[in-house]
């Protein structure tokens, strides 16, 4: 009788362990290799000081997907909020998925996500044009440092490799972006960082434009899904 009870307990514990292991297995997300076309750059990268004027935004240990408009079982979503372009946009940026150059300093940041329509359908070949300040809060207004555009893949997926931008007077950390589906409306917006003291003092801060960030082995990883009007 005792041997039978012991055998039953061992079998039950084995089943519990197998269930826990299956639940802990993460779901992988397919990625595409960035198109680093550095030959398109029309100006050499400016030298960047190793000094920074602010610490990187605080990242959690796991990605908070609450700000991702689609991808959580949603069937519909609001169009990505539009914000001012600002004075630092430069047209005709090089096509590339990485804004890093030789000698770039700062906290590495990899942003991934998708472009969806308002009915949460992925948009292939959507334009994403990014620009930002460097780690010291300075824009390159004579060349194309920290500027670049790319297009989503067949699944609407994009990946941007850059650094956490610095702050400057009146603004906290942010990244500018223009999004446009093929033959669609051009949307100009900005992305913000969670956990930044004083975000609410930024005159154009929008909670719906917060990146979902977590720490990685060599910097930070972030996610954001953009939404454009359905055709």
Regions found by a protein language model. Give the residues of each.
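Ser/Thr-rich, Proline-interspersed low-complexity disordered segments
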Residues: 11-68, 74, 86
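Bacterial N-terminal signal peptides that target proteins for export
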Residues: 1-9
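Beta-strand-dominated extracellular/periplasmic modules and repeats
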Residues: 37, 53-210, 217, 221-231
């Amino acid at each position: 009788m005792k041997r039978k009870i012991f055998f039953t307990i061992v079998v039950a514990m084995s089943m519990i362990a197998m269930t826990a292991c299956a639940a802990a297995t993460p779901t992988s997300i397919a990625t595409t290799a960035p198109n680093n076309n550095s030959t398109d750059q029309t100006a050499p990268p400016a030298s960047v000081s190793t000094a920074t004027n602010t610490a990187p935004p605080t990242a959690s240990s796991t990605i908070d997907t609450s700000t991702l408009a689609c991808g959580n079982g949603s069937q519909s979503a609001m169009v990505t909020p539009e914000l001012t372009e600002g004075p630092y946009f430069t047209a005709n940026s090089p096509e590339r998925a990485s804004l890093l150059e030789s000698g770039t300093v700062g906290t590495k940041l990899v942003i991934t996500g998708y472009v969806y329509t308002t009915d949460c359908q992925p948009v292939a070949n959507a334009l994403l044009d990014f620009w930002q300040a460097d780690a010291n809060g300075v824009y390159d207004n004579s060349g194309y440092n920290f500027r670049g555009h790319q297009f989503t893949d067949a699944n609407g997926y994009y990946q941007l490799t850059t650094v956490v931008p610095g702050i400057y007077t009146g603004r906290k950390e942010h990244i500018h972006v223009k999004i446009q589906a093929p033959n669609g409306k051009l949307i100009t917006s900005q992305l913000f960082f969670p956990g930044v003291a004083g975000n609410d003092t930024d005159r154009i801060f929008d909670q719906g434009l917060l990146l979902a960030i977590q720490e990685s082995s060599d910097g930070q990883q972030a996610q954001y899904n953009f939404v454009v009007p359905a055709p």
